[in-house]
Design a protein with these regions (language model features):
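N-terminal and secondary-structure boundary signal
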Residues: 1-337
Length: 337
């Protein structure tokens, strides 16, 4: 895949944060003034502010797109997993975290859970192949804006995992490799099953990424989350931003900045294998990554998460590029007639 520019900036002032990273990446973007733009946010937490995309960042981005690109059609979109698991709606979470105010700035709010989930894809789970339903944005240019976080399945949770919001609420656990019922009684001490779960989740996210790939990843590292992410972790004041139209490179660079190995993140390895982006970066524009790197305290499951790397390498050594039968796996738009 042709390499796209990756930008890394260092900034600790909220008011200057978006301007600095966007000024740096703007000359390299394919965005046009006539584009219909969607900003995909992450509202994983129903109450946890540091689990979510910060409203101030999105507000600044809306103003930047209008003032510097002349974009007039902007939507802020999300299907909140935090809402689903707390018995609320995405609208409830929008209101709680001030996102209703984007309408005052001329943008629209779109609850992805309210859309028709007309697309279908098969995914790998611990109990076999299952089918999920998902939706798509009608935007010409999608910007995903997320904080850097740890995760109970992957060492790092970034822009690619944010695509889970397109999936029908009750199907999201299947993308992560198991059903909601199985997840509630999952035995994390069973290392083999946990490693298989990590592998399933990585493959599934890479497949979904093919269908709902963002146009631009913007990692808002003013604050991150360490420990028991992606919701119950502790905040980290970090002060960096990563941006790229190669979402795989953006996530890979951020994984390194957080102190983790890129090859330990299953969805990055599978996304690279599927030619969806580069999981290595060259000639980063901006500051040296070594100047920003700050090791995050990993999730308590990290020692088991690290075992997936050897599992994946062993599969490659045996020539198993993908152990899924092609005739079984498909994705298509459901016939609504």
């Amino acid at each position: 895949m042709k390499r796209k520019e990756v930008v890394l900036t260092k900034e600790t002032r909220q008011k200057e944060f978006v301007k600095k990273v966007m000024d740096t990446i703007s000359p390299h973007l394919s965005l046009k003034s006539t584009d219909k733009v969607a900003i995909k946010i992450d509202l994983s937490g129903s109450r946890e502010i540091y689990a979510n995309t910060h409203y101030e960042t999105v507000e600044s981005l809306i103003f930047y797109l209008k003032d510097n690109f002349g974009v007039s059609d902007i939507s802020v979109i999300e299907g909140s997993d935090g809402a689903y698991h707390s018995g609320k709606t995405t609208w409830d979470i929008f209101y709680k975290f001030r996102y209703k105010e984007v309408e005052l700035n001329g943008a629209k709010l779109v609850n992805l859970d309210d859309l028709s989930h007309d697309y279908v894809m098969d995914v790998a789970t611990l109990s076999g192949v299952k089918q999920i339903s998902y939706t798509k944005s009608d935007a010409d240019y999608v910007i995903t804006v997320v904080p850097p976080k740890t995760h109970h399945i992957f060492p790092a949770c970034l822009s690619i995992s944010n695509i889970i919001g397109y999936v029908k609420q009750e199907d999201r656990a299947l993308v992560m490799g198991t059903s909601n019922a199985e997840w509630k009684k999952f035995n994390f001490s069973n290392t083999d099953r946990f490693v298989q779960l990590i592998d399933n989740a990585g493959k599934n996210l890479a497949r979904l990424l093919k269908e709902v790939k963002p146009s631009l990843a913007l990692i808002d590292g003013l604050y991150g989350m360490e420990g028991k992410g992606p919701v119950k972790g502790s905040p980290v004041f970090h002060g960096f931003a990563v941006a790229s139209e190669d979402v795989v490179s953006a996530d890979a660079l951020t994984t390194y900045i957080m102190g983790f190995e890129v090859d330990q993140v299953s969805y990055l390895s599978y996304a690279f294998q599927e030619d969806l982006g580069n999981n290595r970066w060259q000639n980063v524009i901006g500051v040296d990554p070594c100047q920003v790197k700050f090791p995050y305290r990993p999730h308590p499951f990290y020692q088991k998460q690290k075992l997936w790397k050897d599992f994946f390498q062993e599969k490659k050594n045996h020539g198993e590029r993908d152990n899924r039968p092609n005739k079984t796996y498909k994705n298509f738009k459901r016939d609504r007639e």
